Swiss-Prot record:
It comes from the Bacteria. This is Protein ocs. Keywords: Crown gall tumor, NAD, NADP, Oxidoreductase, Plasmid. InterPro entries: 6-PGluconate_DH-like_C_sf (IPR008927), 6PGD_dom2 (IPR013328), NAD(P)-bd_dom_sf (IPR036291), Opine/Lysopine_DH (IPR051729), Opine_DH (IPR003421). Gene3D superfamilies: N-(1-d-carboxylethyl)-l-norvaline Dehydrogenase, domain 2, NAD(P)-binding Rossmann-like Domain. It catalyses: D-octopine + NAD(+) + H2O = L-arginine + pyruvate + NADH + H(+); D-lysopine + NADP(+) + H2O = L-lysine + pyruvate + NADPH + H(+). Its EC number is 1.5.1.16, 1.5.1.11. The gene is ocs.
Amino acid sequence: MAKVAILGAGNLALTLAGDLARRLGQTPSIWAPISNRSSFNDVRCLGSLELVGPDYGGDFQPRLEDDLGTAISGAAFIFLTVPTLGQQGILRELAKFNLSNSVLVALPGSATSLACKQTLVPTFAPIAVIESTTSPYACRRVKARVLMLGVKATFEVATTQPLSEEVKGRFEVLFPNPPQWYQHPASIFFSNTNPVAHPAGILAARDSIEQGILPVPKFYRQFVPQAITRVIAIDEERLSIVDALGLESETDFSYSKKWYGGHACNAREFYETYEGYAEIETPKTMNHRYLTEDVKHILVLWVEIAEAIGVQVPEMKSVVQEASDVLNENLLRTGRGLSSLNLGGANANAIVRALNGV
């Protein structure tokens, strides 16, 4: 069995660790950056955790490593499980090590192939970078219970370098269900659909959040359906960018159906009825990753790429403007844009190559 290292100690990291432990009998190493060890330290105090899944579960003992070098030593697959905001800092830490015998997996990815190309030392770069559109699970931790609320029937991945069938097989077995391979990491970047529903949903919830209304309705049950017209408009603009760049993707609703199944006939019905999302709380503050990450670090870049290739995205722009007003920050200036990635003035081909980690 290929050794696995997990970087991050949040919901996804612990669910992946519990899944590997209970399904495959494997104990991956877990490391978290010193600057963000709240969950890591909680787990250390708890000791043993319990995976609670729809088909299997049980107790498992996470192997926590304080030292990054120890955590990744001998790992065939190194999983980067932190949100976009935390990826760059970890990549800078990884740049100190020889990764040439490992595959780095961004779960999920967010232009991670590009970030690796710009950050890691070429001589010691990983065999390949794999990016995914999403997590394999809907999940969260409640104290010592790691809840695998839903297991996706598949999820999409792409690699910067061709992988042998043997390596692909060792990668695929790490998940409950096999992933679907896309041709380009650039397609993965535009198929991370968090910026489609999250920003529109939290902006719809703004009055309830800022007025402190209690109890606040559940995020996916109430606020995303309330904003569904905007969600669909953003999704259509996303696919227009994808088409213009010659990449592949699907609608947000198509992904939801493919991942989770169910009988929903449209996006609104899915968000209102999918049990895996039913208890997800609405954020308590507007200063939340649905804006500070999904807008500032992904949607802003979508908008700038759209402008560079001549695609009109008025709904995306309106969300960026509204998020800027809420955060009292001009996200088009402070967010992750083409210039900050050294892609100012780049054409469509150069943008795709960069997102592919070339």
